[in-house]
Every structure is written in C-alpha cells, then in structure tokens.
Amino acid sequence: MTPEFDEEVVFENSPLYQYLQDLGHTDFEICSSLSPKTEKCTTEGQQKPPTRVLPKQGILLKVAETIKSWIFFSQCNKKDDLLHKLDIGFRLDSLHTILQQEVLLQEDVELIELLDPSILSAGQSQQQENGHLPTLCSLATPNIWDLSMLFAFISLLVMLPTWWIVSSWLVWGVILFVYLVIRALRLWRTAKLQVTLKKYSVHLEDMATNSRAFTNLVRKALRLIQETEVISRGFTLVSAACPFNKAGQHPSQHLIGLRKAVYRTLRANFQAARLATLYMLKNYPLNSESDNVTNYICVVPFKELGLGLSEEQISEEEAHNFTDGFSLPALKVLFQLWVAQSSEFFRRLALLLSTANSPPGPLLTPALLPHRILSDVTQGLPHAHSACLEELKRSYEFYRYFETQHQSVPQCLSKTQQKSRELNNVHTAVRSLQLHLKALLNEVIILEDELEKLVCTKETQELVSEAYPILEQKLKLIQPHVQASNNCWEEAISQVDKLLRRNTDKKGKPEIACENPHCTVVPLKQPTLHIADKDPIPEEQELEAYVDDIDIDSDFRKDDFYYLSQEDKERQKREHEESKRVLQELKSVLGFKASEAERQKWKQLLFSDHAVLKSLSPVDPVEPISNSEPSMNSDMGKVSKNDTEEESNKSATTDNEISRTEYLCENSLEGKNKDNSSNEVFPQGAEERMCYQCESEDEPQADGSGLTTAPPTPRDSLQPSIKQRLARLQLSPDFTFTAGLAAEVAARSLSFTTMQEQTFGGEEEEQIIEENKNEIEEK
C-alpha cells in the first residue's frame, strides 16, 4: 500500500470487500488489487537506467568483482543458509510449542486459520520434524567448499614436488592453521547461536506451561470456593459439615485468604499479558488485518473493565470494594478476562513468529533472529507467571489440605504415628455415625409428621390407602441409614476395643488367660454408663422387642413343661392373638421387621451389659437363634410364666442363660434377686441390678429335666408386682433410656391384654373374657 492510502478505498477481492459485498454495501470506492504491482514495476523501470551505465566501467574492475564474488560466494551462501535454518527452525519450534500447549481459545485458533493458515501446519508432525533447530553435529559437518579446498591443496602438493622442501612446510602449516582457526571460530559462533535459540525455545515452552498450569489452578480454586459456599449455605443445618462458628458467615467470607490470592494473581498476570500484547502491537506491527483493533481486548480502556484493574497499586480495602467482598461472580469475570488476554497474547506472538514474517536471506543477520524479538516482547512475563503460580499454589494447598482437615500427619516417632492413625480411625467412624444418625433422624421426623397427618385426616379410606405405598417407600429409604449407622458403630467399638487390648497388653497380661483368641478378658470393674442430659440419639430409641411371627400352636404342642387345662389353653391362645394384634399396630408406628440374626446381634450390642465388656468378635448367630431367641408373642404373652420361672430357678443358671436378652438397670434394693450368672461376671462390691429377662420356651428343656415347675399365676395377680418393679426402675437415677423404653413397651403390651375395654376386639370377645374372669374367681 502507498503512504497516501485512503481509508475509504477498499481493494477489490480483499476480505473486507467480500464482507461489505455480503452485507449489501456498494457505496465505496474500489481500487484494483494490481495497483501495488504496477507501482512496483514503475519503480523498477526508474531504477533500470543506472544498470545500463555498467558497461562504461573498466573491464578490470568487472573482472575483480567477479572473482571476489566467486571466492566469497560459497562462504556467504553457507552463512546465509545456516542463519536461515536457525531462523526457520526456531520459528517452527515456537509455533509448535504454542499449539501443543493448548493456550489458545477456539476463537483465536479460527482467527489464526483465517489470517495465516501456515501457522496451523507447523503443529503437524512431519513439518515439525523438518523444522527442528539444526544440531551441533549438522553445523560441524564440512560442506562442499571445505572439501574442494582440501582436495585442491592436496593436488598442488602432489603436482609440485618442490613444495616438499622443509622450509616451505612452515608457510603451508601456518596457512592451514589460520584456516582451521577461522573455521573453528565460525563454528563456535554458530553453535553458540544455536544454543541461545534452544534456550529461548525452552523459555517459551516454560512460559506456556506455566500459563496453562495457572489457568487450571485458578479453575480448581474457584471450584473449591464454590463448593464451600454451597455446602455452608445449603447443608450446614442438615449435615453439620461446617463448624458452627462459620455457619452465620456471609458466603464471600469463606476461604477469604484463597479469594484474595486468586484476585491478586489474576490481576497481576492479566496486566502483564496486556502490557506485552500492547508492546507487540506498537513495536512489531503487522498488516492491518492482523492488527485490527476489534480483535484485541488490550485496547479496551481499563475503566470500562472495572474490578480495580486501572490502579497500579491497590489496597486490600479498595480491592474488597471493587469486587464486592471478593465475591465469586467478580472472581469469575476476572478469570474470563485473564483467559481471553492470555490467549490473545499467544495468538499475536504466533502471528509475529510465523515463517511468513521471516526476513529474506540476504537481509537476515544475527540481530534479526526471532529469539531477540521473543526476549524483547516477553521481558518480565515469565517471571510474573511463575511467581503468581507459586503464590496461588501455596494458598490453594493450604486451604485444600489444612482448612478441610486433610493435612498429612507430621513426621514423628512410629509409635506416635500408629496411635494417631488409630485415633483418626475412631474419629472417622464416630463422625460417620453422627452424620448418618442425623440424616436418619431427619427422615424419621418427616415420616412421623406425615403419619400424624394421616391419622388426623378426615379423608376417605381410598385416599388413605393410596398413601400406604408412599410410606413403605420412605421406610425403605430409612433402612440404608440404619444399616450404615450400625456398621459405623461396630467399627468404632472394634477400634476402641483394639486400643484397650493393646493398652492391657502393655500393662501386663492377667494371670489366667483364655486360650481362645476370640475370648477377651473381662475387666474387674464394671464400667459405668453415663447418659448425657440431652436428646438421645436415634440408635437408643430403637425398640428391639419386635420379632418375626412364630407359630404359637406348635410351641404349645412341644411344651411338656406346663400342664394346663383346655380352658386355660384357649384363654392363653386368645391372649396371644390379642397381643399379636397389638404388636402389629406397634410395628407400623415404632419399628421395622428384623431378621433373627440381626435382632440377636442388636440385642447383644444395645441391651446387654455383657456386650460392653466383650469384644466384637465374630458371633455365630445360629445357636442363639435356635436355642435362646424368644418370640415376640412369648415375650408379651408369658410374662407371668417367666417371672415365676425366674423366682423358682435362681440357682439353676446354665451357659444358655448368658445368651438371653436382658433389660437391665441399676438398683441396689434388688440385690437379693440377682441370679448366679451376674455374680460370676461382676464382683460382689458392684451395684446390684434388676433384670427383666425374656426366655424362650425351649430353655427349660435345655437346662435339664430336674427343674421344678409351678402352675401359671393369673395375670391379674402379677400385674401389681410388675407395676411396682417399673416404679422402682423409674426411680433409679442410672436407669438408661433404652431399658426404660423396652420395659414400658412390655408393660403396655401386658396391660393391653388384660384391659377391660378392648380397642381392637369385638363384643363377642369381651363376653368371653368376662366369662373367663368369673371362672377364675370361682376357682
């Protein structure tokens, strides 16, 4: 283009011309694209007349210039060829690095493809192999001129024997030495230039790598900030994952140190990349299409961008005000600006280092090699990238591993590491148990509210029946939390048991040790169970009195221990049916149906004092289920029989009684009624306990045939004694919530079977019960 280029003139077949044609604009002046060529031809025509003066010069001068050009032709060509190889190799390596590091946005890649398609071809493998910087071996390889000079020198020595005189060797040796020195200096200079280009190529690769690593690290930091905000805002009250002192904080106050580090590093890197791009546009201009201002963000004034970018030095207060307290949206906007500015810088650098912008061979000098351009453009940009990357990495690692309690344990003695690891395992199990129980409690509260609405509703039976599948589905959703809580509780108990066993081994083994590895030593002192003055955890509220349905008639047929009349059997059968009906109602509200193995396991863990003293060794659930597991019907319908058997068989306790389910509470007034199995486990100085024992009907047969039997006592006579025992249990200060709740359920089920006004029965059953009572009074 000419210096008098008019902005209103549009060249024909140019991209701008085609763009205006597509938009329908035709009101502009069209200039032929051949005008630069014609201008060039005219200038060449003006320069041709001086060449016609050449024949007027002397013939000797012309011959001298020809010889001079012939002598130095090879050396100049060799030098130009080496510089050209170094220039092209460095440019191709730089373009390959920029494309391979993926520091360009897709929009910039498309713009490069439009402006200079040859840049994208530099990333191909074949072009990249051919465009490598020449190695030192290739630079030291002699060319044809060196070989021809050596061959001419040898031929002269052979053709002229007089040159073999000793006096002439010194002259030829000096000439050969000077030639070798000159050749070595040129080779050393070229090798030094090649090493310099290689070093700058590595610097460019490091800068691109740091830029990409910084972008990825900022993305991770923003994700961590966003996750922390979501957790603290949405799940604090449900899962208690955030400490209470942070629950009331503003979302932007979480990870405030990381937010400040992200802002500082993004701001510094953005300003450095912006200045480098502006410097390229000013000092290394390209054509008008490549340097169009609409393609660059760096030309947008700082005041329009905001976020405190226009200030050279900004205080923390001002940054807080500009970014609305380092809010997440402001940081995301600044991150998008950095990504666009970084991609813009590498796009302009790729256009500048394109092979199309390489100077021609005669004009190429070491001062015009592209590594000097790269050094001048980048200046302090690599240092800014590395410093910001280190600062942000340090802050991110601190908040990622220390604030979220994922820091590594400090190096210390091996024993301390093992102890800390075991305590961490216990803490992890307890923490998991807490979260599962809280989630379970929330689900149960929601389910309870829905059940209350269904109970109090006045809707038709059809609408109520439609809600039953929903209730069943919600109960199934609760089951995983119950199982997970049980597993976490077992894990915590096993970890604590390991710590206790190790502590016992350190202090000294007891004199009498059991050979069975699964058997643990019972401590001499019974541990005291302290109940905190707060709401009990849902695990203590589980009622384990519910069992699977068992055929009661078959139990009566097998029972040879009691001799009852036909009327008594019918009366007890009706009472069992009534208790079974009551249990079905209780099951739908208070609990869920458990298997035999799970119920036995939960009883041993939750309601037996023996489980506190013994380790969680693998328990075979077959024997306790088959021999000592009571049915719910027998638990609720045979209270009088169990109490009578407990009073008459105090001295006949066997090993099968240890596996019974006991509901215990401390009571010093009932020390005389304590059985022999409790005396074997605990010392005489321990507090006496009151036991409500649930036995199966198969236990008397396992105990032996020598046991004395007593006829069953009527329930009306046993009810006052049970109420007195319950009153004593309620007065006990150390009475646990679980034992009291289980005893209360048993008492209520007993009262349901003997109450005069039946809730679930009919009028015919009431008459039968009154007749039975009259018969008992007559007897």
From Swiss-Prot:
Biased composition (Polar residues): 625-634, 706-719
GO molecular function, one term: myosin binding
Membrane topology note: Multi-pass membrane protein
InterPro entries reported in the protein's UniProt record: Myosin-bd (IPR026859), Vezatin (IPR026858)
GO biological process: cell-cell adhesion
Basic and acidic residues composition-biased segments: 638-649, 770-779
Pfam families in alphabetical order: Vezatin (PF12632)
Region of interest: Disordered: 618-719, 757-779
Subcellular location: Cell membrane; Cell projection, Stereocilium membrane; Cell junction, Adherens junction; Nucleus
The keyword Hydrolase is assigned to this record: no
Transmembrane domains' residue ranges: 139-159, 162-182
Keyword annotations from UniProtKB, A to Z: Cell junction, Cell membrane, Cell projection, Coiled coil, Cytoplasmic vesicle, Membrane, Nucleus, Transmembrane, Transmembrane helix
A GO cellular component entry from the record: stereocilium membrane
Main localization of the protein described in the UniProt heading: membrane
Coiled-coil boundaries: 430-462
Protein family: Belongs to the vezatin family.
PANTHER family the record matches: VEZATIN
Subunit structure: Interacts with USH2A (via the cytoplasmic region); the interaction associates VEZT with the USH2 complex at the stereocilia base. Interacts with myosin MYO7A and the cadherin-catenins complex.
Name listed for the protein in its UniProt record: Vezatin
Species, as recorded: Homo sapiens
